[in-house]
Amino acid sequence: MNTPLSPVSGRLASLDILRGFDLFLLVFFQPVFVALGQRLNFPWLNDILYQFDHESWIGFRFWDLVMPLFLFMTGASMPFSFSKFKNAPNKWHIYRKIIKRFVLLFIFGMIVQGNLLGLNPDSLYLYSNTLQAIATGYLIAAIILLHCSFRYQVLITLLLLLLYWIPMTFFGDFTPGGNFAEKVDRLVLGQFRD
């Protein structure tokens, strides 16, 4: 099924609806639904509420889809927004947009969850938020999208998946404190991590 672009804005309607649904879950539905469920204390509702929190370590819940869905939507919208710049001889205009978006998302992430406005280095977290993950993924994907053919985009994607899978599988263990990603976080970010 093809989802038409809006004739007024040129935006993909299905992507905007999905973005709205994800924001609705994050900002309204989950907080209100959880507060209501705690107030009413219905046993059948507790089973549903269980899905609106993250799993502590191993497992999967519905709420674990919210952040990856934002990353997916960012990536899905990039070919539409970058198509007019792909073959442009001077890409400086799009680079300015990419850098501006990266910096803004990163700073907003530090404000929201990184305690940036607290101005206390002991409680400052440099990389602790979905917005920062979106910013970093956006920057990397933008560079790949603007400079690589579709064939190389697929190849780079497969290589990145492999480069992530190998250390996660063969180095460290599968405990919260012993997995490879946790070790890299401790090494690179040190005290500035959430």
Q: Residue spans of the language-model regions?
A:
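Membrane-interface interhelical loops and short amphipathic "cap" helices
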Residues: 37-60, 115-128, 175-194
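Transmembrane helix-loop junctions in multipass membrane proteins, especially transporters and channels
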Residues: 34, 38, 42, 84-89, ...
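Long hydrophobic alpha-helical segments that form multi-pass transmembrane helix bundles
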Residues: 150-194
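N-terminal signal-anchor module of multipass membrane proteins
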Residues: 2-90
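Hydrophobic core segments of alpha-helical transmembrane domains in multi-pass membrane transport
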Residues: 23-31, 141, 160-168
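Residue-level marker of positions within ordered structural domains that often coincide
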Residues: 32, 80, 145, 149, ...
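Short, motif-level signal for alpha-helix interfacial/capping segments enriched in acidic residues
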Residues: 1-2, 112
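Transmembrane alpha-helical segments and their boundary/interface "anchor" motifs
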Residues: 64-69, 84-113, 117, 122-162
